[in-house]
Amino acid sequence: MKDITSDELGAPEIVDRSTFQAELDALRVREKAHTREGDVIAAARRWLPIVTVDGTTPLIGERGAVTLLDAFEGRRMLIAYYFMWHTGRPASEQCEGCTLYTSQVRELSLLHSRDVTYATFCQGPYDESARYRDFMGWEMPWYSADPNSLKTLLVGRRVGMMHIVCYLRQGANVFETYWTTMRGVEAMDNSYRLLDLTVYGRQEAWEDSPAGWPQRPKGEHPYRTGGRPIVQWPRLKAGHSDDLGNSRLARPRRHQ
């Protein structure tokens, strides 16, 4: 595999149009089967049983103390993204994955038309993390969940990790209907979906690619460049401040 910055990158075999189309048609059969299987899996989610969650679980929002039930904003369903947070650390050291995926959730009107609210539940202090939201220009509802609330909301799961959790409201009763983590949160992503359509793909070492295909340098995080999350750079270049107001708390943090 080649370094992504190399001028000597591999390239596929050049063929005539009919040969190209024949290969693409064969792949399309697999793509359509994949799409149909995705529909079947989505249907299975709709048949899952549900579990009761305490709707009075406290959160902190823009106007202060609220509850999980309040986060529905009157709608029947809620999708909550649980954002990883490094308390007391600067913006450059906040979670690059959560930052990447959250940056791709912008237009919520279609969700709202289906009676779904989308919100971020940050696993850190509200004031500090809300500054980060403002720096990144995000407009979705933003809440902070303290450790006690997280024990309730993420029972049986690893607190501090990224999660998507889906909820249903029936009157004042709240139920959890689905959750996922790790690569499951790619449901929020469109950049990787587009990269997957290109000849060089995601350009990451784990991919099955021909010899000579580019990849990011060994040891370089795929979501970071220049010492911070990639998607922070346009905000800085546009003049937005990344000051989270927590510099007095800063201390060295070991990178693993």
PLM features: residue spans?
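Non-globular targeting/processing and membrane-anchoring segments
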Residues: 1-114, 131-137, 141, 148-256
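Catalytic nucleophile loop
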Residues: 113-129
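Short loop/edge segments at beta-strand edges and connector loops
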Residues: 122-123, 144-146
